[in-house]
């Protein structure tokens, strides 16, 4: 969306329905609220790629002498967005701080995937209210996926008037202008684009660490699973050009990074929106095999778009790791249909068979929702049996959380919460049982570990991850942080492995 489109959209959105309260008259500057109705639309407008991001002269030294603090909730995409916002803050002259008490600007980068995440954000806004009273010049902002929801923005306007700015996921590159508006406005600045944004290249980033890096390869999702708010908050699927991705990863490799995670809400749909070339995730991964970097992984996959070419490429190994996160959500074909997942139990199991055939030592992990509206005991048992049949190493498990604006939120639900909790407990027992069973197979093996740093539980112990994303703890010199080492596994736990260093760092060729 260019500036002209932004202004046109702003004017269009300012004309709200008569029955809705119109807050725009209270604002001197920007009031562009979200619209889930607009966010659901998938137009044929060309997605523009902007490569000339830069700060105008008016923002030179804008943040000199000021500090910023960003609290991040949710997925890796939010982590990456925070890195971009930190890069913009730094370019403006701001310095980071790890304390809200010490900050001149506090941003909450939010997640909308479950109600619990939203409750945490509103709880934090309550804590920040007293801080704002003590420091009236403090700027407080809410950004990320929650900002794309109408109900959230209305709640902020009504009950959290100490918030100075609200912006969404499509206009992070406009952070300097939003900051300026918030700094000089007497009222809350709201700038949320409900239609998909453009692809903005060359945004500054302050990455967390210098060992692993997130790299966005696409944005948005067009799947519209009935329970999921993400297609509304992140817009339509739009892919970065392969040459831009490859250039970024080569630059990271040249700067010593050892592992790259390719990000997308539906990473397997990469390239499906290209009109000038036939180029998908399999093609990209095949090219990235040639980049001089130790490990490349990706998340998150959708089974519907996981094609044979990608499986073939992953089977070539090299720097492509043997770990795939493949959310199934349910083991029941009937339940998958109600969820609008667009695949069946049989399709998923056949996909798993193909993956295991191409990558015999693959580790599969997944996401599962229990207690979806009207889920029967039989349908839940199908999920349990699929989990055993696939033999997942672990899973992220959740009780269904209604998201306002999604079709599932309107469904009548006859499953009592007590039943949902009991099902989750049973599933988690199975997950834990298989996790320790899978991890026990590593005992006595020598594995490659990329050393992340000190263990969270013991600074005398180092921690790192295998190619299959297993956490390994071992005692060794801190000089090995950031290196690839070989570790012999001596003990297997449910969520981690313990081991002993067996040789010097591995040379990455």
Swiss-Prot record:
Q: What is known about its subunit structure?
A: Monomer.
Residues that bind [4Fe-4S] cluster 1, according to the entry?
75, 111, 145
**Enzyme class label:** transferase
| Name recorded for this polypeptide | tRNA-2-methylthio-N(6)-dimethylallyladenosine synthase
Q: Where is the composition biased (Basic and acidic residues)?
A: 16-25
SUPFAM superfamilies, alphabetically? Radical SAM enzymes
Q: What is its main location?
A: cytoplasm
Residues covered by region (Disordered): 1-25
Pfam families membership: Radical_SAM (PF04055), TRAM (PF01938), UPF0004 (PF00919)
Cofactors demanded by this protein: [4Fe-4S] cluster
Entry GO MF terms = 4 iron, 4 sulfur cluster binding; metal ion binding; N6-isopentenyladenosine methylthiotransferase activity
Q: Which gene encodes it?
A: miaB
GO cellular component terms given for this protein: cytosol
**CDD domains on file:** Radical_SAM
What EC number(s) does this enzyme carry? Answer: 2.8.4.3
**Is Endoplasmic reticulum a UniProt keyword of this protein?**
no
Q: Write out the entry's keywords from A to Z.
A: 4Fe-4S, Cytoplasm, Iron, Iron-sulfur, Metal-binding, S-adenosyl-L-methionine, Transferase, tRNA processing
- Occurrences of domain MTTase N-terminal (ranges): 66-184
Binding of [4Fe-4S] cluster 2, residues: 221, 225, 228
Where does this protein come from, organism-wise? Bacillus cereus (strain B4264)
Q: Where in the cell is it found?
A: Cytoplasm
The note describing how and how many cofactors are bound reads:
Binds 2 [4Fe-4S] clusters. One cluster is coordinated with 3 cysteines and an exchangeable S-adenosyl-L-methionine.
Query: Which residue windows does the record flag with biased composition (Polar residues)?
Result: 1-15
Q: Which residues form the TRAM domain?
A: 440-503
Instruction: Give the reactions, separated by semicolons, that this protein catalyses.
Output: N(6)-dimethylallyladenosine(37) in tRNA + (sulfur carrier)-SH + AH2 + 2 S-adenosyl-L-methionine = 2-methylsulfanyl-N(6)-dimethylallyladenosine(37) in tRNA + (sulfur carrier)-H + 5'-deoxyadenosine + L-methionine + A + S-adenosyl-L-homocysteine + 2 H(+)
The family annotation for this protein states: Belongs to the methylthiotransferase family. MiaB subfamily.
